[in-house]
Amino acid sequence: MSCVHNNTSFPVQIEAYLKEVFEKYKELQESKDTSLTARFARALKYYQFLIYTAFSDPKFGIGQGENTRGLLIYHQMGMGKTILSLSLAISLSHIYNPILIAPKSLHSNFQQSLLKLIKLLYPETTDPSKELQKISRRFRFVSLDAYNMGQQIIKAGGSLNGCLLIVDEAHNLFRGIINSANDKTNARQLYNNIMQAKNIRILFLTGTPCSKDPFEMVPCFNMLSGRILLPLHYERFYTAYVNKTTNSPLNADKLLNRLVGMISYAGNQNELNKLFPTELPLIIEKVEMSPEQYRQYLLARDVENAEKHASSGMHEKINTAALCLPGSEQESGSSYYVRSRMISIFASEMLTIKEDEKLSEAVQQLPKEAFTETSSPKIVCMLKNIKTSPGPVLIYSQFVELGLHVVARFLEIEGYQCLQPLKVLEEGHNAILLHKDGKDLMVKNFAEDEPTHTLVLSSKITRFTLITGKILSKERDMIQQLWNSPLNIHGEVIKILLVSKTGAEGLDLKYGRQVHILEPYWDKAREDQVKARIIRIGSHDALPPEEKTVQPFLYIAVANQKMFYSIPEGSQEQKTIDERFHERGLEKSHLNSAFRDLLKRAAIECAFNGESGCLMCQPTNALLFHENFERDLRLPNPCQPLVKTEVKAYSISYEGKQFFYQKNKGVGLGYTFYEYNPIIKAYIEIKPSNPLYIKLIKHVQAGTTV
């Protein structure tokens, strides 16, 4: 069986196929079959096995032949996208060369996930690490954030021809492409290489597609289809598919037709949601700046406004280059607001930096007097909330030196101890540095050594640690293992983990009870990414039901009211930068969320999962879309809604096959005929244009039934 995605019959064909795969999955779950397929059925969740089978089945066609070249794996964060991609890499490695592209900090995540998968596949093995080495030799790793990514790809396989390309955190690639001013960037070079590659299979892994702008869909689906499926220019894309008046999708039906067959979505199913901890409603703490803090904030805003006016002419012309966002969109991530946003977190005149002194050193020397409700009301408010947490706590800030490091210094002053992984130990050790009775103690093999457990837990010190982009992957893994230790269920080992954007990516954490986001961002998907570090499938299984909850907090700095009303009317900024970022984020989130809903409706599992609004057409075998998107918009929609009804009809046999018919004077030549379609396991109407139609009429009129 094979099916082509640009066909009205594809949606019903894929639904029927997945139903068959699911029945096979249930059988293999209970069997003692030792084949590789059976082992994967027992190792994978059902939603993973559906995609594993559809993608690896040489007869079906997902990602091969006349079909597209791969899938956007849009699975809710924490549902095992890495395990799914590694399963396909193992199964297809004899045909395609697996190349895994991810930020450098996440490479070890793949190794850990691969070891986990090997243990699931081969529970009888006594040495999974040996099998890990054997399988790992088939894979090539490339750093998405490396300056020489192109050279790494050449070294990994010479080219992308004949490879299985797996891109983790793929939304970063999509953003990188549309933020590129030219073809010289890593992201744009990778896009061009993928578009030119032959015999390539692709898996884009992300839990947050369309997080910055719907235009991210363009490079994504052009690469998956291997052709210009969506318009390259921002203005053309928005004219075709975005209603700017209502801030919602336009021509959604035509866009769905083009996307079907390239998306896998998992995340809304009730049975899956039961496996996640409960995310409690977001608590937004609007923290009024102190008079001194607000004074510094206003000075910073004056400087930022002056810089903005000085460069105002630089972005007036709309950037119409292919695969580029207009210049006005690039402003959101600019440096214009960095000063004021950092002051919104911490403002102390005690933070003075000499020419020969690094900022981090200056932060480390801050005295207790520097941390008051005058200098850091946000941090003071956050710590009050943290003290109410019954378990581990995650803190996020975009800013490292004047965000996370300032918080870390405040925690030290408050009596918390910084837990630091040691860099000099042999690979495989879980080592920490802790302070007890005035001495520094090196603790090795934490995960295995019982006396070490006693030593750590008896110290009765509340610990915190940091993961930023500068930390080594081995140290990062060590911290994650310590956090996820059964001994850390209530934060006994690590109570607080501070993470940056880069540091947070790929973390898989258990037991977390609170998430604190220190400043809003105009991209709400980033906040979702942070929360998803501890809101994951099975992350709270070890906790009793009443403790399987996560409370998120967001901190927004607002104006000092007394000073605000003392400013002459007309000179006031009605909203702080924090407030503007938050509101902008909600506005953008509305549009991006609407496009993500379209992706869910076009997902190959949509109808199988019983979701509403799925793209389901009458299987007429007509083309689902015209290759030219502008002409496609002018043509009638070939996808006529599929309506399943029961009709009363007569049975006849013709040339050994059974057909049904109705006498209907208002249709065709007075008859409606139906034939059985084994792919969708239902009867479909035979069109009058089909030569079989006339033969069946003659057959009926002749009065024969054989």
UniProtKB/Swiss-Prot annotation:
GO terms for biological process: DNA repair; DNA-templated transcription termination; replication fork processing. SMART domains: DEXDc, HELICc. One of its GO terms (molecular function) is RNA helicase activity. Residues 62-227 form the Helicase ATP-binding domain. Residues 378-599 form the Helicase C-terminal domain. A motif (DEAH box) lies at residues 168-171. This is Termination factor NPH-I homolog. GO terms for cellular component: virion component. It comes from the Viruses. Belongs to the DEAD box helicase family. DEAH subfamily.
